[in-house]
UniProtKB/Swiss-Prot annotation:
Major location (coarse): cytoplasm
Binding site for Mg(2+): E432, D456
Oligomeric form and interacting partners: Homodimer.
Gene source species: Priestia megaterium (Bacillus megaterium)
Name the record gives this protein: Phosphoenolpyruvate-protein phosphotransferase
Additional notes on this entry: The reaction takes place in three steps, mediated by a phosphocarrier histidine residue located on the surface of the central domain. The two first partial reactions are catalyzed at an active site located on the N-terminal domain, and the third partial reaction is catalyzed at an active site located on the C-terminal domain. For catalytic turnover, the central domain swivels from the concave surface of the N-terminal domain to that of the C-terminal domain.
Assigned GO CC terms: cytoplasm
Broad class of enzyme this protein falls into: transferase
Active site: residue positions: H190, C503
């Protein structure tokens, strides 16, 4: 009997295939007394080594298929396996209490997971998820249990799961896995982001697919509208095959725009750029018609290693990106470490709330040797392309002035050394803290440009952790408060003749695009795979026709009102 299940559209496309339930066995742990504690510690170490080997393989597969930025999460998992704060208490428990490795691991991991989950911030939630994923793998080795391996799937299927861990998602073979659907998760969960990178249709947050779908049943995953159809009729299958064909035709039409400029129906030009993490990501930017790089996340250069990258290593990476972009603008964000990104070799003290703590520009202004090394590398690379530099997490005008002063000092030093440096480097800032948006008029007199980081701006403005399912309903890109802040920033910048970009998820969202175009956003930076769809949409919109509706939109009192109005007025969905 056909059943329709509603979820969240996480990755566009239509998948029609038999269900494959990805079920991991219950890992039952019993407490046992042991006398040979050294042998038990050796068992633990062997399981840790096996897990490391597996994760290294998964990391390399993810790097090859998805790029360095998506593989970075497995660096975090490998760090968990080597973290003495986790591993030493497990060994101590085995030695001091004469208990088996499984019990010691389970007890210590549960303690850390509960501790991190009780703390109300995104970084700690992700830390708990990392520990859960990693310790489950180690526990399976200790128990001699085989955990499901998605990479072994050898027929066309739709995966059904309660959730997909990052390691599960990275192992999906796109040849056979046509789509997936999960009980939990949202558009910003790791599995959803990776699905979009891999272009695998996905519907998440359904709550009931594991309960409602058995192995082998035909399933349709509609990643366009967020629906899952179980055991569809022949007529329904034909209808969705037609929908899939229409979507494929639409994608083919978008592909024709790869070398076109992004111009609205009334001839207003905007720039569509891409967010990248490594030089390898440039290929995807160019293949999808990106007009620039709107966000180069430099922190990936610093991760998965035992010490800071040298000036020469950084110079080589920046130079490569600038050369490959062949004169198109490249906006580089200086080091944004802290919050959800740790560098163990810096030995920074633990913080109760790292997202509001010692991170990004705050860290760089104090650890100036590290900051100056990065700036020197960027300045040296500037002659190889169109470089723009921006500072993250700026809260006060004085912070921006300090950061820019250090940049100018390093520029002067290089020139004294006879090193050529571009004279056309624009220097801007991220707007991701509400205070920055509120005084954007003051910042606009200092900066060359703004880039609005909506992912953090939304969280900080609405005090809502987007990874916390209990409050994720408050993560609202179209909330009137967010739209008004964006409007304030754009108006303040344009008054001073400065340009404004946006590099959060919102920039590529089909509901946000008409509003942002009307407000006058100059640059939209998104995942490379979203560029052509966004270009097609903008070419059909008239900025002049949108502008009369802006006061109405900005005066609405809820997200729901905004979405309904935009959909009906601009014919979306």
């Amino acid at each position: 009997m056909t059943k329709e299940i509603q979820g969240i559209a996480a990755s566009s496309g239509i998948a029609i295939a038999k269900a494959f339930r990805l079920e991991n066995p219950e890992l039952t742990v019993e407490k046992k007394s042991v006398t040979e504690v050294e042998a038990e510690v050796a068992r633990l170490e062997a399981a840790l080594e096996k897990s490391k080997s597996e994760l290294e393989i998964i990391r390399e597969h993810a790097r090859k298929e998805l790029g360095d930025d998506k593989a970075e999460i497995f660096e975090a998992h490998l760090l968990v396996l080597s973290d003495p704060e986790l591993i030493n208490p497990i060994k101590d428990k085995i030695t001091n209490e004469n208990v088996n490795a499984e019990h010691a691991l389970d007890e210590v991991a549960a303690m850390f997971i509960n501790m991190f989950e009780s703390m109300d911030n995104e970084y700690m939630k992700e830390r708990a998820a990392d520990i859960r994923d990693v310790t489950k793998r180690v526990l399976a080795h200790l128990l001699g249990v085989n955990v499901s391996n998605p990479s072994l799937i050898s027929e066309e299927v739709v995966i059904i799961a309660e959730d997909l861990t990052p390691s599960d998602t990275a192992q999906l073979n796109r040849k056979f896995v046509k789509g997936f659907t999960t009980d939990i998760g949202g558009r910003t969960s790791h599995s959803a982001i990776m699905a979009r990178s891999m272009e695998i249709p996905a519907v998440v947050g359904t709550k009931t697919v594991m309960e409602d779908i058995q192995n082998g049943v035909l399933v349709i995953v509609d990643g366009l509208d967020g629906e899952v159809i179980v055991d569809p009729s022949e007529e329904t299958v034909k209808a969705y095959e037609k929908k899939a064909a229409e979507y494929a035709e639409q994608k083919a039409e978008w592909a024709k725009l790869v070398n076109e400029k992004t111009v609205s129906a009334d001839d207003h030009h905007v720039e569509l750029a891409a967010n990248i993490g490594t030089p390898e990501d440039v290929k995807g930017v160019l293949e999808n018609g990106g007009e620039g790089v709107g966000l180069y996340r430099t922190e990936f250069l610093y991760m998965g290693r035992e010490d800071l990258p040298t000036e020469e290593e950084q110079f080589t990476s920046y130079k490569t990106v600038l050369e490959r972009m062949e004169g198109k603008p490249v906006v580089v964000r200086t080091l944004d470490i802290g919050g959800d990104k740790e560098l163990p070799y810096l030995n920074l003290p633990k913080e109760m709330n790292p997202f509001l703590g010692f991170r990004a520009i705050r860290l760089c202004l104090e650890m100036q040797d590290m900051f100056r090394t990065q700036l020197r590398a960027l300045l040296r690379a500037s002659v190889y392309g169109n470089l723009k530099i921006m500072f993250p997490m700026i809260a006060t005008v004085d912070e921006f002035r300090q950061a820019k002063a250090i940049l100018l000092e390093e520029k002067a030093k290089l020139q004294q050394e006879g090193v050529q440096v571009s004279e056309d480097i624009e220097v801007g800032m991220m707007v991701e803290i509400p205070s920055s948006a509120v005084i954007a008029d003051l910042f606009a007199k200092e900066v060359d440009f703004f880039s609005i980081g909506t992912n953090d701006l939304i969280q900080y403005t609405l005090a809502a952790d987007r990874m916390n399912e209990r409050v994720s309903y408050l993560y609202q890109p179209y909330n009137p408060a967010i739209l008004r802040l964006v409007n304030m920033v754009i108006k303040a910048a344009h008054k001073e003749g400065k340009w404004v970009g946006m590099c959060g998820e919102m920039a590529g969202d089909e509901i946000a695009i008409p509003i942002l175009l009307g407000l006058g956003l100059d640059e939209f930076s998104m995942s490379a795979t979203s560029i052509l769809k966004a270009r097609s949409q903008i070419r059909q919109l008239s900025k002049a026709d949108i502008e009369p509706h802006l006061d109405t939109i900005l005066s609405m009192s809820s997200t729901e009102e905004v979405i309904e109005f935009v959909k009906s007025t601009f014919h979306i969905g």
